């Protein structure tokens, strides 16, 4: 048996929930604790529940741990439609209400962080707390963009057309391109395994995956992060992979503190996906923070 096959056998079994007449994939591990909230782990763009397998394994002895594939990603359905933060916010909120059955600690990476923040701000009855890991989403007072480059605008408009978008999708889902992208956003290259590349590529082979890819890039921006923080009341933990080339974590961290001073944050030697790159550190910090909420 290969190392990949051995690792796969230690993952929580797939389960499915029907939402809006579509099949939504999730996993659950661990036992409910009366005095501890369940965890709900939410992946980033192009990822899935598979990206959390190290965290599920490390946290399931202390918590009931759920992870879900957002509609359009992973093993969840990929119907034609508009994909946006409001869709995933509704999905997460209704999943907590219907399947988990009590408020959860939402932990989200990148796009999943933004969707989780939307739930915590707009549906406080679903959120016992929020953990953000290199979360996506702009602030209202972000620096104004430079004068638009007409060539860049033309390229963007062309790429949003069906054929160029499809060709771009075919390119970015190649294993060699996935590996190259991971090499850009992971500091520890040993964490970039064949298994990880396969986990990211597999959903891109599903019918509808190319349309989801195009729809996400066409979707309008949702609520700004500061607007969401001003509505939120639950505890907040932020874990930054400080080596992330896609965001200035220190500057973004200062913005979060400006709008939500009562937070806990840690900066880790990792890239865009600290939960997968340094899972032991993330699991320890998350565990200690959640257990400390009731004290």
Each language-model region and where it sits:
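An N-terminal hydrophobic leader/cap segment in hydrolases
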Residues: 1-16
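Conserved HGGG/HGGXW glycine-rich cap/lid loop of the alpha/beta-hydrolase fold
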Residues: 22, 27-75
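Conserved alpha/beta-hydrolase catalytic His-Asp/Glu region
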Residues: 24, 166-234
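Conserved catalytic-core motifs of eukaryotic protein kinase domains, centered on the activation segment
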Residues: 51-53, 76-82, 142-143, 249-250
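Conserved acidic catalytic loop of the alpha/beta-hydrolase fold
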Residues: 87-104
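Conserved hydrolase catalytic core segment
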Residues: 101-146
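Conserved loop-alpha-helix segment in the C-terminal half of the alpha/beta-hydrolase fold
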Residues: 231-270
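Catalytic active-site module of serine/aspartate enzymes centered on a nucleophile-bearing elbow/loop
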Residues: 261-295
């Amino acid at each position: 048996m290969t190392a990949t096959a051995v690792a796969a056998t230690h993952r929580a079994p797939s389960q499915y929930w029907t939402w809006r007449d579509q099949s939504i994939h999730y996993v659950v591990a661990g036992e409910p604790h009366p005095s501890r909230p369940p965890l709900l782990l939410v992946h980033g763009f192009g990822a899935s529940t598979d990206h959390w397998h190290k965290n599920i394994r490390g946290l399931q002895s202390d918590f009931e741990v759920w992870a879900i594939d957002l509609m359009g990603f992973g093993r969840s359905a990929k119907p034609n439609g508009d994909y946006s933060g409001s869709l995933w916010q509704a999905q997460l909120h209704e999943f907590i209400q219907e399947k988990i059955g009590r408020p959860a600690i939402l932990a989200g990476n990148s796009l999943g962080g933004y969707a989780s923040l939307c739930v915590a701000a707009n549906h406080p009855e679903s959120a016992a707390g929020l953990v953000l890991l290199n979360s996506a989403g702009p602030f209202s007072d972000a620096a104004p963009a430079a004068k638009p480059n007409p060539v860049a605008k033309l390229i963007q408009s062309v790429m949003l057309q069906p054929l160029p978008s499809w060709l771009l999708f075919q390119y970015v889902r190649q294993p060699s391109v996935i590996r190259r992208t991971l090499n850009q956003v992971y500091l520890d290259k040993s964490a970039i395994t064949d298994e990880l590349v396969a986990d990211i590529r597999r959903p891109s082979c599903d019918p509808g995956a190319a349309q989801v890819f195009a729809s996400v890039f066409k979707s309008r921006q949702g609520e700004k992060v500061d607007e969401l923080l001003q509505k939120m009341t639950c505890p907040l933990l932020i874990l930054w992979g400080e080596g992330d080339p896609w965001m200035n974590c220190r500057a973004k961290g200062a913005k979060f503190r400006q709008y939500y001073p009562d937070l806990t944050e840690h900066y880790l030697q990792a890239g865009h996906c600290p939960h997968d790159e340094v899972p032991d550190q993330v699991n320890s910090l998350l565990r200690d923070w959640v257990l400390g909420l009731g004290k």
